[in-house]
Amino acid sequence: ECYRQRSDIRACAHAHPPTATGFACAGYSLENCVLPEIVLALGGIPLTPYGTPGGTEIPDAIRPYLNDYDAFLLANHGCLTVGKDVFDAYYKLEATELFAKISLTARLLGGEKPISPPQVQELYEARPRYGISRQTRCVHCGDEHEGACEAPSGAPKESGPAAGSAAGQPADVQRIVEEVTRLVREQL
């Protein structure tokens, strides 16, 4: 499906990197405009709806996202990236996993702090200087980068190109800390 929909795609990489897959299994996208390198190189990383492996459900699930993104979290499954060659697709897969680790750490430390819309716009305008010709869009503030560049708080969503993202709410952090503490104590 990737090759049919976009002529610039010459390679796909699919894997189950643990942190990115954890986000996919928890129902969270990686679309907040937080890390300049990711905004510059990938834009955002949406969570696609669940599809049963081996059939047409996964290609059907990613189809609505292919024109706007190069990296995807596959709900309850893993990660898929596309690129101009195998090295480009692999680099994007590695970048997705690194961003997932950074995002998880930021959320555990109290929440992500998004880049301002003017700063996001500046990064998008810098893409040609770095040889990045594709323009992706911010699902939270749109192409014009007006408004907040972060996902609205609330329950994660997995349907549609504007899928939600974890908000790093204090109650969530507290629950995680309590669970980790309990598990550590069990091991002592």
Annotated model-derived regions:
Residues 1-188:
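Glycine-rich flexible loops
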